[in-house]
């Protein structure tokens, strides 16, 4: 099998010739390379929307920073400014003042319909397919989440109050965000990506941030709308869902909505083996390997042992191995051990 076939088979819950791997779920610079997945020849490459034209200079600044300076995902930082979200300065949130839908002034939310945001996207996907690589694509940050985008626009504490006291406003904001997301996932589907990356951190290490009933009331139907639009545009595309923390309680409901693969299933938050025993190889698992201490302070042999254990207990069907945490501070020899172990044991 080539990489594209391998990933598509694994994410369908079937058995590939070996377990595929990636270095995360977005393109990230490591060890002087702009793309860790290219550097280590993983099975997946990632495409993304271009930054807004008026903010494109930020990318030049980010790329000029030393390798040991980490300021977050460039894909996130490029879009924060236009949404009025400035966590580094704790500036007021764009919709902090709103008490009802009538208070949301037209034009405060960014226009995501500019075709310049996805110029060349189809060509990028086609070029990667010619290399027989699987291609994953995510909507732009803030334009690609529901829960996270809403609380960043309102402020976290204020949005928690909204869910109880200002539900018409919540519905209005989430409907606007859902419309943006539907358009963005349709663009990605029509560009030909193999895996649609949906990302919404609804959990902490101790469980869901909001109750399951609140998630079902506000977020499940809208997520279903997004997935439905993606399926209509590209029926064979795999649907990926990421949340930090422990979202075990949502796994069966995500699968019922059409999610094919969940991520990162971090071992210090979720029990991947219990999920596998309960649900089988669908949804597939993307991630599962190591907590932050393993990657940052563990030895290459410990990484190898973790990979071998994951393959033996979770694989080979329905599994794509990846670090369950960012690799910003991981020694290169640990990442090399991960790749070598996947190829040896997978």
Where is each model-derived feature located?
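Catalytic cores of TIM-barrel enzymes
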Residues: 1-346
